[in-house]
């Protein structure tokens, strides 16, 4: 089940399905934030796919193609638990599957959940390949440097994220 989330102000970001006219990549989702003053926040406007079939722990590969009008355009991907409980502070928990080979101590400036990539060539389809370890989760999208309370833990066999998550 694909979905669009757009919490930006009207006219800032548009997300729509379009036919590209390209025989190899005939259909695409287009995200246009040319009305924005800066890049779109990770939680404000995105295209996602919800997964409710149930996953098994292991290494998964997410592959897609992206194209941008300008070289250097950032693309981000993460896999998050759909429904979260509130913690003791009254805030919603955030549970993400971890990028494969992430080490919070060795990579203190990197997110363990979010894969960040920059499109190198303008107007050219670029293959993006990301590996996720569904056997581990992190409790925040931020880096350990910006969130010293960042926790990496093994995924429980009956964890809710294995039954209902979405990829962005």
Task: Spell out what each predicted region is.
Residues 47-53, 112-121:
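Beta-strand-rich interaction surfaces with strong enrichment in secreted/lumenal proteins
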Residues 55-57, 70, 119-125, 161-163:
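Surface-exposed coil/turn segments at beta-strand junctions on protein surfaces, enriched
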Residues 1-10:
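Extracellular carbohydrate-recognition regions
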Residues 42-44, 89-116:
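Short beta-strand and strand-turn-strand segments in soluble, beta-rich domains
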Residues 127-168:
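Extracellular beta-strand ligand-recognition surfaces/modules
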Residues 78-89:
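Short edge-strand/loop segments of extracellular domains
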Residues 1, 29, 33-35, 44-79, ...:
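Extra-cytoplasmic beta-strand recognition segments
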Residues 13-40:
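Short carbohydrate-recognition loop motifs
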């Amino acid at each position: 089940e694909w979905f669009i989330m757009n919490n930006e102000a009207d006219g800032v970001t548009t997300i729509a399905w379009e036919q590209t006219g390209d025989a190899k990549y005939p259909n695409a989702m287009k995200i246009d934030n040319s009305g924005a003053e800066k890049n779109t926040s990770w939680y404000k406007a995105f295209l996602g796919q919800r997964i409710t079939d149930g996953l098994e722990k292991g290494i998964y590969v997410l592959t897609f193609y992206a194209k941008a009008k300008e070289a250097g355009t950032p693309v981000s991907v993460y896999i998050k638990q759909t429904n979260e409980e509130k913690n003791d502070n009254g805030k919603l928990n955030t549970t993400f599957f971890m990028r494969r080979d992430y080490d919070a101590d060795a990579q203190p400036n990197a997110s363990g959940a979010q894969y960040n990539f920059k499109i190198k060539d303008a107007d050219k389809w670029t293959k993006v390949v990301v590996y996720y370890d569904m056997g581990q989760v992190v409790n925040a999208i931020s880096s350990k440097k910006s969130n010293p309370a960042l926790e990496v833990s093994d995924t429980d066999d009956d964890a809710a994220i294995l039954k209902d998550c979405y990829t962005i």
